Amino acid sequence: MELTRRDLVKFGGGACLVASSAALAAPVAAMAEEAAAGHVVRSAEVAFSQEADILIIGTGIAGLAAGMEPALAGKKVIFAEKKGSFGGDSASSCWFMFASGSKPQLDAGLTTTIDQAWEAVAEKQTAGFDQYEWYPEWAKGKYYANTKFVDCAIENFGCQIQEPATADELPRLSASVILPAEGIGTGYTYILSPIQAKLEELGCEFEYEMRAVALIKDAPEGAVIGCRFEDAEGAYVDIKAGAVVLATGGFVDNGEMVTKYLPEWANMGVLVHGSMGEGHRMAAAAGAQVANMDSSFTYCNLMGDIPNATTWGYWAPLVLVLPNGKRFIQEGQSHDAAAAAIEAGYREWWVIFDQQAFDARCIAKSVENNINVHADAYRTADTIADLAVAMDVPADVLTATFEEYDGYVAAGEDAAFGKTSWLKSLSAPFHALKLNAVRYKTSGGLMVGPNNQVLDNDGQEIEGLYACGAVTTLSYASCSTVAATGYFVGETLATK
């Protein structure tokens, strides 16, 4: 539908762009009055060329989840994605998800219901935001949305998950973990792709290579009614919507923002490309409060550049060593390996494993895929001494490390690092993957209110502007909570 400038008046007056550092644009009226003073390069009047009930910016799991219930309800939904395909950062996720009381968990004999799970965690989940009287109910809604997302994804969108892990397979976390059908790292195939395909089947439109540059309001202090994009040819595209959802991810690939908010990470490499903080900046320009931008130090972590391998220690015995051949961490805690390696003076480490990792159904596909994809970082040998040579670490030190580790196994106690789960010896042939410490995700950003609309600097909701996923403070950049915040937004919009 082509909308003219005259049509805009019918929708509540002249629309205006909200300028951000990503795109400088002046309100049309001001441009007309001050044309003699100059002209902003590449500024243009608002000219809506498309319209939808809901415009979702970003197609990671948060964005896709935000579209599920609206699509089922028959809403017209447009997804806009700056990359050439869907998935966002979620495409490279480990897909280590959590839920309680979902249908597959109950069917597997796990007896905890969502109501029981909430009762156990309600006090913790609702703490910290006493200034908002609505927060406890919102926190409950987000928590329940996590389980609802799992059930809806399976029942209505054709997603496939593994049978829940047993306590023997996952000693620390078994009852609450949800994994895609072939385990860790297979979420693109079994979660993202089915959801995206079903959304298209339900009539949702996907616009790729569309970079969001500025939100559009119906007045400078009014409601958000759309967004301006730049397409692959550099032309502006303005899309109008009754609700605009920011699902734009974090800011881990924005060196300027990382330097400002997370200076300790500024000189680290980055694994996930494209998380530039555009949503943060566009929302701030529209009057949104941006908070807790340094919370990555609490809720996120540096990661290995083969992120799946960072989780294998939950499922199988591993030995992690530094380039000096020494252990440096309790391997079941390997999400913290990057930080521990840096503290020890290194930015790299080796994950050493054996056939037990190939046989563990929850990580087997991930192990096989990663040694094939990362052949340059993969080594194997029949003895520890030969493995040390292949890894270019001191053979005498690595041999001593394994002798010490095997002693702890025999004693039934890891006196060095306190490892309990998977305190087992490795046997030949031995395998190793080299990991480098990188930035992987960030936390902090927008706060949403009781109706899932973004809060302004006065704590009031900005009409028409919604947010979910890593652009929000309360998703903590976790795969599960990112999906939950998206689904929760979708529940809100499906009934509007």
Predicted regions and their residues:
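Glycine-rich loop(s) and the adjacent beta-strand/alpha-helix scaffold that form part
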Residues: 239, 243-303, 488
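Conserved redox-cofactor binding core of oxidoreductases
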Residues: 140-235, 255-256, 409-427
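Glycine-rich FAD pyrophosphate-binding loop
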Residues: 73-90
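N-terminal secretory signal peptides and thylakoid transit peptides that target proteins
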Residues: 1-16
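A glycine-rich dinucleotide-binding beta-alpha-beta segment and adjacent secondary-structure elements
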Residues: 397-475
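C-terminal segment of N-terminal export signals and the immediately downstream linker at the start
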Residues: 1-2, 23-61, 71-72
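Core beta-strand elements of the Rossmann-like FAD/NAD(P) dinucleotide-binding domain
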Residues: 50-52, 234-243
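An anion/pyrophosphate-binding glycine-rich loop and adjacent beta-alpha core
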Residues: 280-282, 289-393
